[in-house]
Amino acid sequence: MPELPEVETVRRGLEQKLNNFIIKKVEVCRDSTVAYPSNKEEFIKGLKNSLIYKWDRRGKYLIAQLKEVQNENTEFPLENSQNNGFLVVHLRMTGYFKFIENSTHPCKHTRIRFFDKNNNELRYVDVRSFGQMWWINKDLSINKVIKGLGSLGPEPFSKDFNANYLKEAISKRTKSIKAILLDQTIVAGIGNIYADESLYSAGISPFREARTIKKNELIKLKKSIVIVLKKSIGSGGTTFSDFRDLEGENGNFGLQTNVYRRTGRECRKCGNLIERQKITGRSTHWCPNCQK
């Protein structure tokens, strides 16, 4: 599943490529991709003549701020134009976007297509079809419509995410620290890859009970999380199967991982073999010598 660095890579690509993109037509190729409104025609109607004004990210969600455009000759910028709600996207396991100039026939696994007046297309492709989209009317609360958004913990790059916050959040938790990092209500956007890599960087065993981790270790863990995530974003994220950026390119962070998917290979620090075991159903990679 795309995690924070992959979603942020997509967000940056969308923001760069879709400057002043006005949706003139929407084609829903798979109804189940539209999570809200329940009527796909309402989804299509709501998005038509909307300018994609700005792309944001919250955890693993992409959020497009929309502006209402009645006249194609409207002058930019449109800061003062009427809001037209939000387009929210969760890529889930295999979803990704493609931007196509002078659109052609849809490729296999195309789920939703957005067109501008010049027939440029923003295409959403999803092999396993778990991804979802929401059009949220300007009069509605995003957090009320999408329950998962409202329950997200702080962003790893935010001031709210620090050692003091972590210490309080885990003080009574008997779960492993790996399970804690995967809990989106505690910290938003971290998944299996970056939990493993961050714990390795911090020298903390993924099996440690969260409540046993000392504050000085949490300071190091928070720093490691930020460093690992920034490094991955700089590499365009990680591609092991379906993830692509807007240009169709793979992420390169997978070539730099220290433990993730390196089972049986030598630790880059100590030479000990990397091991793998499941924690709460998720494959976990670590170095028993470097992580305590």
UniProtKB/Swiss-Prot annotation:
Binding residues annotated for DNA, in chain numbering: H109, R128, R173
GO MF assignments: 8-oxo-7,8-dihydroguanine DNA N-glycosylase activity; class I DNA-(apurinic or apyrimidinic site) endonuclease activity; damaged DNA binding; zinc ion binding
Zn-finger region bounds: FPG-type: 258-292
Keywords, alphabetical: DNA damage, DNA repair, DNA-binding, Glycosidase, Hydrolase, Lyase, Metal-binding, Multifunctional enzyme, Zinc, Zinc-finger
Entries under PROSITE patterns matching the protein: FPG_CAT, ZF_FPG_1, ZF_FPG_2
Enzyme Commission numbers on file: 3.2.2.23, 4.2.99.18
Keyword Metal-binding: yes
Coiled coil: none
Annotated InterPro entries: DNA_glyclase/AP_lyase_DNA-bd, DNA_glyclase_Znf_dom_DNA_BS, Formamido-pyr_DNA_Glyclase, FPG_cat, MutM-like_N-ter, Ribosomal_uS13-like_H2TH, Znf_DNA_glyclase/AP_lyase, Znf_FPG/IleRS
Names of the cofactor(s): Zn(2+)
Reactions this protein catalyses: Hydrolysis of DNA containing ring-opened 7-methylguanine residues, releasing 2,6-diamino-4-hydroxy-5-(N-methyl)formamidopyrimidine; 2'-deoxyribonucleotide-(2'-deoxyribose 5'-phosphate)-2'-deoxyribonucleotide-DNA = a 3'-end 2'-deoxyribonucleotide-(2,3-dehydro-2,3-deoxyribose 5'-phosphate)-DNA + a 5'-end 5'-phospho-2'-deoxyribonucleoside-DNA + H(+)
Record: active site: P2 (schiff-base intermediate with dna), E3 (proton donor), K60 (proton donor), R282 (proton donor)
A Pfam family assignment: zf-FPG_IleRS
Cofactor note: Binds 1 zinc ion per subunit.
GO biological process, any: base-excision repair
NCBIfam families: fpg, PRK01103.1, PRK13945.1
Job description of the protein: Involved in base excision repair of DNA damaged by oxidation or by mutagenic agents. Acts as a DNA glycosylase that recognizes and removes damaged bases. Has a preference for oxidized purines, such as 7,8-dihydro-8-oxoguanine (8-oxoG). Has AP (apurinic/apyrimidinic) lyase activity and introduces nicks in the DNA strand. Cleaves the DNA backbone by beta-delta elimination to generate a single-strand break at the site of the removed base with both 3'- and 5'-phosphates.
Record text on subunit structure and interactions: Monomer.
Family the UniProt entry places it in: Belongs to the FPG family.
Record protein name field: Formamidopyrimidine-DNA glycosylase
Taxonomy of the source species: Bacteria, Bacillati, Cyanobacteriota, Cyanophyceae, Synechococcales
Name of the coding gene: mutM
